[in-house]
Amino acid sequence: MKIMVINGPNLNMLGIREKNIYGTFSYDDLCKYIKDYPEYKDKNIEFEFLQSNVEGEIVNFIQEAYSKKYDGIILNAGGYTHTSVAIHDAIKAVSIPTVEVHISNIHAREDFRKVCVTSPACIGQITGLGKLGYILAVVYLIEYYNK
């Protein structure tokens, strides 16, 4: 199984930005945590981790997932979650099961964060569970393909 993990703007600043909201782990720590999580270590999952602060690059990543025949996408679009019709449309265009993840509970924060433009294109959203949200997204994609 091939899963592309796409992180959007400012996720490269994990461990530096708003530690009270996002925690003290770095972006590299997050990627290692996902890749090495023991729950699915024996499932032979191939991960590709990508991060960009640029909306168009995120659209390109999603399109590349299609051409590289990925089975699933885990997406934390960061602030673009609330504004990007382009990312929404890219997810719809490729028809790859996509799970949206947010480290913080976006529904318990500022009102503008409660609007999710990208979520309706995804098969699910996990929010507010910290880095564990990514693990749950992987487990869900495994189950999605095993049903």
UniProtKB/Swiss-Prot annotation:
Q: Which domain of life is it from?
A: Bacteria
Where exactly is the site Transition state stabilizer?
Answer: 17
Q: Which family does it belong to?
A: Belongs to the type-II 3-dehydroquinase family.
| InterPro entries according to UniProt | DHquinase_II (IPR001874), DHquinase_II_CS (IPR018509), DHquinase_II_sf (IPR036441)
Supply the name of the protein: 3-dehydroquinate dehydratase
Q: What keywords is this UniProt entry annotated with? A: Amino-acid biosynthesis, Aromatic amino acid biosynthesis, Lyase
Question: Which residues are noted in the entry as substrate-binding?
Answer: 76, 82, 89, 103-104, 113
Reactions performed catalytically: 3-dehydroquinate = 3-dehydroshikimate + H2O
Its taxonomic placement starts with:
Bacteria, Fusobacteriati, Fusobacteriota, Fusobacteriia, Fusobacteriales
Which sites are catalytic?
22 (proton acceptor), 102 (proton donor)
GO terms, biological process: amino acid biosynthetic process; aromatic amino acid family biosynthetic process; chorismate biosynthetic process; quinate catabolic process
Q: Does the keyword Lyase apply?
A: yes
What general EC class does the enzyme of this chain belong to? lyase
The record's Gene3D superfamilies line, in alphabetical order, gives: Dehydroquinase, class II
- Pathway, per Swiss-Prot/TrEMBL? Metabolic intermediate biosynthesis; chorismate biosynthesis; chorismate from D-erythrose 4-phosphate and phosphoenolpyruvate: step 3/7
Which Pfam family is one of this chain's hits? DHquinase_II
Please list the GO terms describing molecular function.
Answer: 3-dehydroquinate dehydratase activity
Checking SUPFAM superfamilies in the record gives: Type II 3-dehydroquinate dehydratase (SSF52304)
EC nos: 4.2.1.10
Question: What is said about its interaction partners and assembly?
Answer: Homododecamer.
What this protein is reported to do is described as: Catalyzes a trans-dehydration via an enolate intermediate.
